A protein has these predicted regions:
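N-terminal presequence-like segments and the immediate start of the first folded domain
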Residues: 1-103, 107-120, 126-189
């Protein structure tokens, strides 16, 4: 891939060698994160984000971050209607994509012993908000009602291009849970 002189200058200012591999850092002994983070996975319904093909991506499906005082923050990356192999499911069917997206987020939460009652915020990206917002709001309201959510999470809806043209909706979420909660697989109790 070709880099411009300006791009190389910015990379060098960050201590990244423009000619080296993507992970090459010229500053040995760089500090680690001050707060431990653990990747969240739900392989029964979602592939690892880094396994997308044909293009590689650089993000995690979610992170588990201890906040102290027995609280844990779950940050779930934008999630859409994809299967365990990373393939889009329900192309062209907004409502079915919305239900699959909610299913995928539910499995990510369950992998950490969390539920939708732990969600404090969502950000919802809709490809065509004028066309699909009615269906979006109907499905979300039906789901939240079925889950018994009261209060409902804080939320923002944004019209946005999503990473693939056949994906019509993507949702990211933030949850807070108590450390050691029943069901938190492999976590401190």
């Amino acid at each position: 891939m070709r880099t411009t002189a300006e791009e190389r200058a910015e990379m060098e200012a960050l201590g990244i060698s423009p000619g080296g591999p993507a992970g090459d850092r010229r500053r040995p002994g760089r500090a680690k994160a001050s707060v431990p983070r653990t990747i969240i996975r739900a392989p029964d319904v979602l592939n690892e984000a880094t396994d997308y093909r044909p293009q590689t991506v650089s993000f995690s499906r979610g992170l588990r971050v201890p906040l102290g005082n027995g609280l844990v923050l779950l940050l779930l990356s934008g999630t859409a209607s994809v299967d365990e192999h990373g393939a889009t499911i329900h192309a062209g069917d907004f409502r079915a994509q919305m239900w699959r997206t909610l299913r995928n987020l539910t499995r990510l939460l369950e992998s950490e012993g969390a539920t939708w009652h732990d969600i404090v915020r969502t950000t919802c990206y809709i490809r065509d908000i004028e066309r699909d917002y009615g269906d979006f709001n109907d499905v979300r309201t039906r789901f939240y009602t079925a889950m018994g959510l009261d209060p409902m999470p804080a939320s923002t809806g944004i019209q946005a291009r999503i990473c693939r043209t056949d994906l019509l909706v993507e949702i990211e979420a933030m949850a807070i849970v108590r450390e050691g909660r029943k069901g938190m697989k492999g976590r401190k109790r």
